[in-house]
Design a protein with these regions (language model features):
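Positively charged, small/polar-rich N-terminal and surface patches that mediate targeting and assembly
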Residues: 1-105
Length: 105
């Protein structure tokens, strides 16, 4: 299992979610509105508020789906402009179902 975490522009969320839902056996995702900044900082002449609205998308997926999902995120969240976002992939060593109180495989 792998965790995929992406930081994208808010207006890209619906398009991304629709594309991911087309995948057979897509396990689902969480999305939350956040504020942050990276290299695309605000011009210092503007009123100072370095934080930009973003959406953080998280999902835990089987190893064999990682490349396909990352490609979809890179395609669907791309505008070609600064601040398009980032995608991170990290291993998940264990997962548990709270309802079933069992470890998931």
């Amino acid at each position: 299992m792998q965790e995929i975490r992406a930081y994208i522009k808010p207006f890209m969320l619906e398009k991304l979610a629709l594309a991911l839902m087309e995948l057979p056996n897509f396990p689902g995702m969480s999305a939350m509105t956040i504020k942050g900044f990276g290299k695309e900082r605000v011009d210092r002449l503007q009123e100072f508020d370095p934080f930009i609205d973003k959406v953080r998308v998280e999902m835990i997926v089987p190893d064999d789906m990682v490349e396909q999902i990352v490609r979809i995120i890179l395609t669907e969240a791309h505008s070609g402009n600064p601040g398009d976002g980032k995608v991170y992939v990290a291993p998940v060593s264990r997962a548990f179902s709270i309802r079933l109180q069992t470890e998931e495989k």
